[in-house]
Amino acid sequence: MNIGYTKGLTLLLLVRMLSACHSEGKEIEENAIRFESVVVEKTYPVENKKDTTTEGRVLKIHFTYPTEYANRGVLEAVQQQFVRSMLGDTYAQLPIKEAVNKYVEDYGLHLKDRDVSDFEQDTEDRTAVMDFEGEEFDTSDRPSLPEYELLSDSILFNQKDVLCYSVYREYNAGTPSPVRTYTNWVIDLKTGNRVTESEIFNEDYKDDLAKIIVDAIALYNNVDKVADLENIGFYNINEIYPNRNFYVDDIGITYTFNESDIAAGALGATSVRIPYEKVRHLMRHDSPIAHLVF
């Protein structure tokens, strides 16, 4: 097994290059939080004698996580959010490097000598009812005996006491094409808590926001009428609703719908970016991101 650690300064500079923006020639100051990365690549031998389809099963992890922040209590809370989003609730209370090592160890144990382990069956059952903000949301969902699994995260926005990142998961269980998912997280760096959809929108926002989302998808796909989306691979447009899988920046809010959520899998994930001016009337003035909106 190869495990490597990337120190924070290099990564901080990389994140700054990727996410820093300029306004009238002035660079926007980022939050004073440092990151490191742990990289894991491990091949598990197939010990089930009935399985002759592959020489081994591969797990790859590229985990970027915060290591330094002025408020120690907030830092610990944010670190737990990162572990929870990347590895699942089971590992959230462990120190990050210990959590990664434990995940890698458990992964092998659950694959060993089983067609479908109890653990995998439990997480597979939860996949059908994934709740991006629910208390029982566990991102360690995986199929039975995947041929490979990739896990990575990326920082999307890191300014004005708000930190947004996305977790990417890809796996293949012997099907013609892999499964790919993106899960977005918005963190309030004043508290270390995750920011939820219900915290930033007024009551009864969903119908109005759904229409705005569908209109944005139609505009991006250059169709004359929103109903025409169904002719190019989208499912019933009346069933497209905000799914709580979003991130924010200083321009607007972006929703991600994963493959097959609202459209045929061949279309891939759908990303919907909406400027605040389009949704400001639906948003709360007392939310953790209100200073970005108003």
Residue ranges and their predicted role:
Residues 9-15:
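Hydrophobic helical h-region of N-terminal Sec-dependent signal peptides
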